[in-house]
Amino acid sequence: GSIPCAESCVYIPCITGIAGCSCKNKVCYYN
């Protein structure tokens, strides 16, 4: 929830989700 994963999730889910990232405010964040 605090560290950006350098990925947006406006149109597609977070590919970095496999690394623990999740979508928040159209941006992928880690924890």
Swiss-Prot record:
Family per similarity comment: Belongs to the cyclotide family. Bracelet subfamily.
Descriptive protein name: Cyclotide vico-B
Keyword Disulfide bond: yes
Job of this protein: Probably participates in a plant defense mechanism.
Keyword tags: Disulfide bond, Knottin, Plant defense
Free-text note on domains in this protein's UniProt record: The presence of a 'disulfide through disulfide knot' structurally defines this protein as a knottin.
GO biological process, one term: defense response
Disulfide bonds: C5-C21, C9-C23, C14-C28
Cross-link (Cyclopeptide (Gly-Asn)): G1-N31
Alphabetized InterPro entries for the sequence: Cyclotide (IPR005535), Cyclotide_bracelet_CS (IPR012323), Cyclotide_sf (IPR036146)
Pfam families named among the record's database cross-references: Cyclotide
Superkingdom of the organism of origin: Eukaryota
Post-translational modification: This is a cyclic peptide.
Phylogenetic placement of the source organism: Eukaryota, Viridiplantae, Streptophyta, Embryophyta, Tracheophyta
